[in-house]
């Protein structure tokens, strides 16, 4: 019996071994530029080269995977494609990873006229052909990107694909711009671009391409042949009235295989916000934030060119040198000098659980000056076996603000310096990955706020609040991962150090003596008690040591499914001004993603986070954050825990030009601290109290975009619904606040004829807020509509007419609806382009804006720029 059982087990083992088969996977890349080769056919043949034993196709990252369960000892692997030379390789019949290099061999079709599709797809790469979207009115590539389904471009130049921001912006496969690519979006000439490639689930580290994929896309600009390796430059001058206005721009660029550069200068006082579009990074890093400031008008929901009074100079230098195939150097420098003024009236209405609301009215006038300098130097090696990155950054921001509110004057000054260094070294040996990371950062931010007519004491004529923040951070990381078939096992260890200092002092000056240390301040006894001197100072040091162990396991079936479970455990030792404590912080996460079909993709995620507060949430002494607000925290580091569950579906069909997505997210946060505020006339005191509380968030969104090529029309639409519930304390009463919001947007861009194209965009928002389980205290409906018409006649002449409409239901009278109109005429001949623009033709003097948050209603009446005329002359140097 045992002999039969042994024979059966041997046969079963042999059968299972044969059924399991072997796995052959790897990447295919182009020899010319080492870029991934998408859409390449990868086939397995027997030794006779006739019988096909396996077939696959590379995805957008050039990855492929084949399975073979036969008995042959060796096989023939063949790579074919319409734009590559066929390549064959004899390989052993065993589990292996292959890196295949192919050369291009374009297919030429003679005397054939084919109407090109506007977009196509190969694996994870979606290609948009610029010529199918561009018209005579498009100057920068950002103008064309707005017409491509699935791609959205913000006014700042930030790009999102299918509702998610991109993680890289390439020009001919080279990453020169980094996180500040808005300058390229708004300046690279549309006429120089042949196609735009979107790499879905893009992994920027080549050594991890077939191991770890992301859920973000990257965008790559492919140049026309005549735009490669040549200098393109332009200069523009402009003058206008009313008031006296000027504009000056200079631009130079060159893109080749070994060298890329983009040089810009822009200056104006016409209200063009170059700073947010081309200077400031989209992803603000964890720098020190200002704690003080002057009270200014809130930003209204209209285009900044309509109300921004500025005087700006901005210059940038961006250069990238490719030393060899995978080694490059990036150098960047940016300088900004900006002065902005604003005037208007604001009203803040505070609602309470019981009793009538309190309304605070202010006449605000402000002047804000900024000088900013950013420098970055980076050397990077990015190959399929080795990733090395060494970067050094310097950021300096010098701000000064002068403001008045009635009889109160405010002067704020801050100087921020940030130095950063990043070193990353990652090595791949087969399916095993080793990496070392070391980040260090030093930041310093001294601030001073001078306030006259001090509101918190009748005996004080002037107050001076000083705050100095300083921080040093170091992050060190070791990582090891190994792949076994469909499984990846990864472990990461961190040893982090953080040292933060916060010093503050409030000094006062009365009418009889000079500046001195503040004595106790007296308040309305109904809500306040006297504040002693020692509560007006802070001298804090926060030291942290983190030892983090992050194990992760991943099961990867390729496109159909990938599941990743990570469980970071952070042991944190904190020392606060001599007092030590320790705790564990947990951040587990489970993600399951993949392709349900060739066109439909899914992503499901569950995560839990433990977060500990920073030093700016620790101080217990009062700080005068602006002229009418005193704030303090509990003196204990706040802790927040959160649980989030999300799901997302993405659909794309390049043949029909349809791209869509839908997402749903729920989260709950638990906090051990709550903010309490007391309002006494125009004075506001805010403090943090130790109290357990929680908040809930629920959000659903839908995005869809469709290209109708026969109509030369692109339609983008989105809808977002959100619900939030949280707790606050006001006038010593605990209140549960509920806020619901619905936002919708639709944009249509169409070319009606060879001489007429139009753009329409409409957005609406409905926000209601109030106490939970009660009728909403307020509901705001907001509508914006914009219509643009471009008429081209006799080729060089273009007429541009635009009209814009705003509606806010909480505003009464004639200001409930606001209309703006503009008209411009441009003429182009040879290298010159002349434009004459008339702005704000209907000449509304003010704009009324209302918004709500946490049972507070903010309304402002802001002075607008007057009707004006601007003449510009642009000269193309190459």
Q: Where are each of the predicted segments found?
A:
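Conserved C-terminal beta-signal and adjacent last beta-strands/turns
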Residues: 745-764, 774, 778-878
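Short, acidic Ser/Thr/Gly-rich low-complexity loop/linker segments typical of extracellular
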Residues: 49-63
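Face-selective signature of the C-terminal outer-membrane beta-barrel domain
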Residues: 324-338, 368-403, 409-577, 588, ...
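A short, solvent-exposed loop/turn motif at the edges and junctions
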Residues: 45-51, 74-90
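Outer-membrane beta-barrel translocator domains and adjoining extracellular loop/strand segments
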Residues: 209-211, 274-280, 341-358, 399-409, ...
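Structural motif
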Residues: 27-38
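Membrane-proximal, glycine/serine-rich, low-complexity loop/turn segments characteristic
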Residues: 20, 43, 61-65, 85, ...
């Amino acid at each position: 019996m045992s002999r039969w059982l042994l024979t059966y087990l041997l046969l079963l083992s042999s059968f299972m071994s044969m059924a399991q088969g072997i796995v052959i996977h790897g990447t295919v890349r182009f020899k010319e530029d080492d870029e991934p080769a998408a859409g390449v056919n990868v086939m397995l043949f027997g030794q006779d080269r006739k019988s096909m034993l396996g077939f696959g196709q590379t995805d957008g990252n050039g990855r492929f995977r084949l399975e073979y369960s036969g008995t042959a000892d060796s096989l023939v692997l063949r790579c074919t494609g319409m734009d590559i030379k066929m390549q064959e390789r004899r390989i052993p019949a065993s589990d292996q990873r292959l890196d295949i290099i192919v050369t291009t061999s374009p297919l030429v079709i003679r005397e054939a006229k084919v109407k090109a599709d506007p977009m196509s797809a190969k694996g994870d790469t979606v290609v948009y052909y610029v010529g199918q979207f561009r018209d005579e009115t498009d100057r920068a590539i950002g103008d064309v990107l707005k017409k491509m389904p699935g791609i959205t471009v913000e006014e700042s130049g930030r790009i999102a694909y299918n509702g998610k921001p991109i993680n890289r912006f390439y020009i001919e496969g080279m990453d020169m711009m980094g996180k500040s690519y808005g300058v390229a979006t708004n300046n690279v000439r549309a006429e120089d671009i042949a196609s735009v490639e979107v790499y879905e689930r893009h992994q920027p580290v080549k050594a991890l391409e077939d191991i770890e994929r992301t859920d973000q896309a990257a965008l790559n600009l492919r140049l026309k042949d005549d735009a490669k390796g040549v200098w393109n430059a332009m200069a523009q001058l402009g003058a206008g009235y009313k008031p006296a206005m000027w504009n000056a721009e200079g631009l130079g660029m060159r893109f080749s295989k070994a060298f890329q550069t983009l040089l810009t200068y822009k200056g104006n006082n016409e209200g063009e916000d170059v700073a947010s579009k081309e200077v400031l990074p989209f992803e603000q890093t964890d720098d020190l934030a200002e704690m003080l400031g002057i009270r200014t008008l809130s930003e209204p929901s209209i285009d900044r060119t309509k109300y921004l009074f500025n005087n700006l100079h901005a210059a940038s230098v961006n250069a990238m040198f490719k030393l060899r195939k995978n080694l490059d150097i990036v150098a960047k420098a940016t300088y900004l000098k900006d002065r902005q003024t604003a005037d208007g009236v604001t009203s803040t209405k505070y609602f309470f659980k019981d009793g009538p609301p309190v309304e605070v009215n202010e006449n605000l006038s402000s002047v804000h000056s900024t000088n900013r300098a950013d420098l970055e130097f980076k050397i990077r090696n990015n190959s399929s076996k080795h990733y090395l990155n060494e970067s050094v950054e310097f950021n300096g921001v010098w701000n000064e603000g002068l403001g008045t509110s009635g009889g109160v004057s405010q002067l704020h000054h801050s100087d921020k310096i940030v130095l950063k260094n990043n070193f990353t070294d990652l090595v791949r040996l087969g399916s095993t990955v080793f990496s070392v990371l070391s980040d260090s950062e030093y930041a310093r931010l001294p601030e001073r706020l001078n306030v006259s007519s001090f509101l918190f004491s009748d005996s004080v004529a002037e107050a001076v609040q000083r705050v100095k923040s300083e921080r040093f951070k170091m992050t060190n990381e070791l990582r090891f991962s190994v792949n076994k078939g469909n499984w990846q096992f990864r472990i990461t260890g961190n040893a982090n150090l953080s040292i933060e200092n916060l010093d503050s002092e409030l000094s006062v000056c009365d009418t009889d003596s000079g500046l001195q240390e503040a004595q106790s301040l007296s308040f309305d006894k109904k809500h306040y008690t006297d504040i002693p001197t020692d509560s007006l100072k802070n001298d804090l040091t926060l030291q942290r040591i983190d030892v983090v162990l992050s194990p992760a396991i991943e099961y990867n079936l390729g496109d159909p499914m990938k599941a990743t479970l990570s469980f970071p455990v952070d042991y944190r030792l904190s020392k606060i001004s001599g007092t030590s404590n320790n705790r564990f912080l947990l951040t587990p996460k489970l993600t399951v993603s993949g392709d349900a079909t060739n066109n439909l993709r899914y992503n499901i995620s569950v995560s839990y986070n433990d977060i500990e507060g920073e030093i700016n949430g620790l101080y217990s002494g009062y700080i005068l954050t602006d002229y009418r607000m005193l704030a303090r925290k509990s003196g204990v580091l706040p802790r927040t825990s959160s649980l989030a569950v999300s799901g997302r579906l993405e659909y794309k069909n390049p043949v029909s030009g349809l791209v869509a997505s839908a997402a749903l997210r729920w989260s709950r946060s638990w906090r051990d601290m709550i903010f309490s505020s007391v309002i006494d006339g125009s004075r506001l005191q805010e403090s943090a109290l130790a109290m357990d509380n929680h908040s809930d968030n629920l959000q659903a969104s839908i995005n869809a975009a469709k290209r109708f090529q026969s109509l030369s029309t692109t339609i983008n639409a989105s809808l977002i619904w959100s619900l939030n519930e949280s707790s606050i304390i006001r006038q010593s009463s605990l209140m549960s606040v509920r806020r619901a919001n619905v936002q919708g947007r639709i944009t249509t861009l169409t070319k009606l004829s060879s001489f007429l194209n139009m753009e329409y965009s409409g957005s609406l928002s409905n926000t209601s807020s109030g106490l939970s389980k009660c009728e909403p205290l307020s509901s705001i409906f907001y509508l914006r509509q914009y219509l643009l018409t471009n008429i081209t006649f006799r080729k060089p002449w273009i007429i541009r007419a635009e009209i814009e409409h705003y509606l806010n239901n909480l505003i009464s009278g004639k200001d409930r609806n606001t209309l703006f109109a503009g008209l411009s005429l441009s003429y182009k001949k040879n290298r010159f382009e002349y434009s004459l623009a008339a702005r704000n033709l209907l000449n509304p003097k003010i704009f009324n804006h209302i918004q709500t948050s946490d049972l507070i209603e903010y309304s402002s009446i802001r002075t607008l720029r007057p009707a004006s005329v601007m003449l510009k002359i642009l000269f193309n140097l190459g």
